Amino acid sequence: KGGLLVFAAGAALLVARGLFASPLVGVRLDGAGTLRFGVNAAIVAGAVALIAFVWSLLAVPRDLEARAYYELAFWGGGHVLQFAWTLLLLVAWLLLADASGVRVPISPRVVALLFGIQLLAVFATTLVYLAYDVTSVEHHRLQTWLMRIGGALAIPVIAAAVALGLARRVRGGPVPAQARPLLAALVVSL
């Protein structure tokens, strides 16, 4: 139990720092602004995940068998946390692509829209928590559905765009020595 509290405190401090120190997206939605939006969306997802964890821990009956207790206690928050990780992964792909000279054939607005859909799914989690008990089948099904719809939409689109840009970059001639490690990291992360 103590380890979970230390982990939760660390996560809460990280999210709080992110919320108070996150860079502004800006008025003009260019590539950098879109990436800032993605990072900010991940921070918000982390905050909602922490709220979901606390809510679930308070709502799940303590007299359940240990496996059932922990599954119910961490189901909703865990799904929301996956949104944060996915957003950060997508931002990392786009950053690595840019840093290694890969031109990704997708507009910043489309990427921002995909990030926004994930953020809407994160906010929909609060509706699931308000509408259904944490121990209900509906709660679990809707959390899974949110991951399938909101979470899975951006991954193939951005991965395909990065892969296409990567293929074009590799065919375009030799890669500068300083970009090779970044390009390798991008390739193995896809």
Task: Report each predicted region and the residues it spans.
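Hydrophobic alpha-helical transmembrane segments of multi-pass integral membrane proteins
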Residues: 1-190
